Amino acid sequence: MNFHEELADRTAWTENVVKTFLPEESGTQKAIMEAMNYSVMAGGKRLRPLLMHETYRMFGGTGRVILPLMAAIEMVHTYSLVHDDLPAMDNDQYRRGKLTTHAKYGHAMGVLAGDGLLNYAFETAMTAFDCGEDPERVAKALRIIGRKAGIYGMIGGQVVDVQSTGRAIDQEELDFIYELKTGALLEASMMVGAVLAGASDEEVEAVEKIASDVGLAFQIRDDILDVTSTLETLGKPINSDDRNEKTTYVTIHGLEQASKDVEEISELSLIHI
């Protein structure tokens, strides 16, 4: 099995893990479950839960305690996309080739679906305490997700991103946005995998640095695709950054240099191994 086949196989397995933890669509309030499940199952690379599991395996983890955390991190990521697509933010109608949650279910349900996913993510993550593993590791993992998803992580980056709309920003501020908005959840994913497997503090710190570099390279690549891809290929509107008057690596450095930056940052991440 080559790399691409192995990746496809593990991604499919990860997809099934996430799916098993989604809420049952029943009860008087089942409309919110439908919107939540639609949001999660509308496609995606499942990069964060996949990285979490692979890091867990790398440090010798073999138990099932990782599974609810894998589902939880994907729910947190999805809620952020649902809210990012709202009219008050990027106002996108398509993501992953399908209607965004608010475009399909309405603005109010888009807000509530995102809220529901964030809350249900932690409800799901808490079930890791029932897996018979070290509760201190589980508690540490939950703290990591909470901080990296919150005002000192993803939300903090989103705030500065919103404030920067319509004005030019410098490289330092752009890197701050990218590290928090994109990098923080990737850091959380890999750190949680390491923590649950019993990695040392030094190893967890190294993993965090690697994930930070990966997150920056990932976001720059997304900047490039926003101006070079198509709606059909990318699954979401192109030129969204330009439409929303956002500064990106492409607007600062141009396409050629941005592509070189992706390669350089990716190589830089290897020094932490």
Language model segments and positions:
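Mg2+-dependent prenyl diphosphate-binding active-site environment of isoprenoid biosynthetic enzymes
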Residues: 9, 13, 22, 26-269
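Conserved small/polar residues in nucleotide/adenosyl-binding loops
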Residues: 271-273
